[in-house]
Amino acid sequence: NSASVTVGYSDAVTGARQIRILGLSGVYTQMLDENRPAMRGIAAPFELSYVPGQWLESIQVSKGLSTVVNGVESITGQINTEYRKPTDEKPLFVNLSAMNDTKTDVNIASSLQMGDSWSTVILGHISGNLKTFDHNHDSFRDDPQMLQFNFANRWLYYSPTGIQLRFGIRALQDSRSDRRTPSSQYGWV
């Protein structure tokens, strides 16, 4: 029953989205990164925005208490994300998008085969909402200002004898500002 999985806004100031499974907020849902625990603590409300959609190969959603095998955080369920693999057939993927509300996304994915044993995938993502508006003139922006840089490099070594070695690095930088307009910070309306 997928009706028990919903996406909602958890924070009006930052605009963070949160998954609700079985009616409970995202802090009771465990986010997995290729079956490894991912976002925890203060990053939990932003866990969905830290996973660029163009990087994904698949998503698996599990609901209920039977999912506590992978950790105690998964009271209501788990969301597992699988990323593009170093052995991906597409050598280069570029995606640019700009919405009419000034939100911009840039995604790059490149898979490289380096001989018979080594392969790598380089993933890049930049998203931002740099210019925001206050259409109803209530001294609060309609969306928060934000800028996010996300980079990952994953490697795979596969020997003819069957030995595999997988490793990688991932970096994330996210900056957000509140929804107050500059004039409301000083009491001007």
Question: Which stretches of residues belong to each language-model region?
Answer:
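Structural signature of outer-membrane beta-barrel domains
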Residues: 26, 38, 84, 99-101, ...
